[in-house]
């Protein structure tokens, strides 16, 4: 599976898992929300191990840009708040950084 696809799936798993904690602590949802949340966070961590790189730190650094894009998608789709131009500009800069990390000659 291509690194971008793994990173995108990992981002969805992490955001969904973290949102369950947000829902529990900030929105007053049941603590039972944490069960699928913890499973989702475990899937997130497992997915990052699937990236073809010998260095974990590099995998995490490249993942950061993808996470930002996925978070803004979550903001728009799940929370109904449209990202503004500053969100999009920041995401573009972060994505450029991720691309440099992923494409760098090694």
Curated annotation (Swiss-Prot):
Membrane-spanning residues: 4-24, 31-51, 61-81
Keywords recorded for this protein, A-Z: Cell inner membrane, Cell membrane, Membrane, Transmembrane, Transmembrane helix
A Gene Ontology cellular-component term: plasma membrane
Localisation: Cell inner membrane
Predominant localisation class: membrane
Signal as UniProt keyword: no
Membrane topology: Multi-pass membrane protein
Pfam families given in the database record: UPF0060
Source taxon at top rank: Bacteria
PANTHER family recorded: UPF0060 MEMBRANE PROTEIN YNFA
Family: Belongs to the UPF0060 family.
Protein name: UPF0060 membrane protein Smed_0659
Organism: Sinorhizobium medicae (strain WSM419)
């Amino acid at each position: 599976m291509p690194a971008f696809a793994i990173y995108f799936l990992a981002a969805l798993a992490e955001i969904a898992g973290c949102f369950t904690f947000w829902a529990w602590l900030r929105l007053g949802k049941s603590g039972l929300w944490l069960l699928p949340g913890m499973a989702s966070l475990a899937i997130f961590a497992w997915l990052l191990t699937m990236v073809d790189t010998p260095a974990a730190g590099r995998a995490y650094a490249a993942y950061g840009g993808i996470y930002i894009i996925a978070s803004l998608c979550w903001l728009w789709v799940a929370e109904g708040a449209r990202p503004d131009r500053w969100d999009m500009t920041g995401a573009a800069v972060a994505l450029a950084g991720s691309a440099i990390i992923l494409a760098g000659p090694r």
